[in-house]
Amino acid sequence: PNSNIELVLSKAADVIPYVEHGVCDMGVVGKDTIMEKGGSFYETLDLGFGKCRFCLCGKKGEDFYAGYHTRTIASKYPKVTRDFFSRKNMDVNIIKIEGSVELAPLLGLADAIVDIVETGTTLKENGLEPYETVAPISARVIVNLASMKLKKQQIQALTEQLQEGLRAKDEAKKQEAKKAESKQDK
C-alpha cells in the first residue's frame, strides 16, 4: 500500500545491466541469462516458475562420449557450454548459433547442441534427444550490490512477500490436487 515500487519491463538480456548499474534495485531474470552473462549482483530468490533445463542433446541413439575426438557443439549459450565441458575436462569447439540450434547436428555442423529444453517436443520432432542435463533453469530475483546494503530492509521485506506468495501458490496447488484426487476416488 505505501510502496514506492516502480516496475520496468525489459528484455531478459537487459535486466542484468539495469540491476548491475543501479538503474533498478532488483530484477527478475532466468537462470539461463545469469549463467551466460554473469555479472555483479546478488541472486536472492528462485521464483520457481519458467522451469526448464539446459541440456546436451544430439541425434537419437548416438553415444556422444564414444571415442576420443574433439567434438563440435552448437549453442546460443557459448559460455554455459564452455563451462560445462570445462568441468568435464573435455576439449570442444563451440559454434554460436542464434536461431534453430537443433538443425546443427542434422545438417552436420555440430556433433551435438547445448540448448534449453522444456518439454523436449522440438528435439523429438528433429530426431534428437537429451543426453545429459547441464543445469536446471527457472526465474530468479537479482539485487544490485549497493541497493542490498542501502535498502536492505525494503529488499528483504519484498523478498519475504514474494516467498509468502510462492508458498501460498504451492499450498493452493496442493489443495487443488487433493480435491481432484478425492473426486477420482468417488
Locations of the language-model features?
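Domain-level signature for soluble enzymes in the chorismate/prephenate branch of the shikimate pathway
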Residues: 1-186
